[in-house]
Amino acid sequence: MILRTAEPRDAAAIAAIWNEIIDHTAITFTTERKTPEGIVADIASRGPAFIVAEDAGRLAGFATYFPFRGGPGYAHTKEHSIQLEDHARGAGLGRLLMAELERVARAEGVHSLWAGVSGENPGGVAFHAAIGFTPIATLPQVGFKFGRWMDLVLMQKIL
């Protein structure tokens, strides 16, 4: 398994991982599919804060962070996203990606990482708790997908 900074050539594979999750799960509330062009723009704007896991030449997942909120007062706080192909879950890849993302975050002066985890994703909540994130709040019924309202669990880790 190789962890490395995402490159534009990864955009189609990243979009494919995202779109499988968007189309078939409540892990994310979004229903808007990702495009390779949009991913290329994200890679360009995030630089080393967009990490991919490559296994035998194929992407198995990615982790990235982005501004939590606008304004200079939030400059050292980031929200992150980690997504894995279904076959890659439960084998420790998520821990590896997050350890590398946290290393990059510390090097870039990030103080606080946030996760917004779907209440429909208890595995995601457990994963984040296991790597040191603290549940801060549950926002009831703020997401709507697949014809139903869903909760969002906010989790934070001080680096």
Feature locations, PLM:
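Acetyl-CoA-dependent GNAT
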Residues: 31-87, 98-99, 104, 158-159
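Conserved beta-strand-loop-alpha-helix junction that forms the acyl-donor binding cleft
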Residues: 89, 115-125
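Conserved catalytic-core motifs of GNAT/GCN5-like acyltransferases
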Residues: 64-67, 72, 114-117, 129, ...
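Glycine-rich phosphate/pyrophosphate-binding loop shared by adenosine-nucleotide-utilizing enzymes
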Residues: 1, 58-62, 150
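A short beta-loop-alpha structural element at the N-terminal edge
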Residues: 2-16
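Helix-loop element at the rim of GNAT/NAT acetyltransferase active sites that forms part
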Residues: 16-33, 42
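Conserved acetyl-CoA-binding loop-helix of GNAT-fold acetyltransferases
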Residues: 90-103, 126-130
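Conserved GNAT acetyl-CoA-binding A-motif
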Residues: 105-117
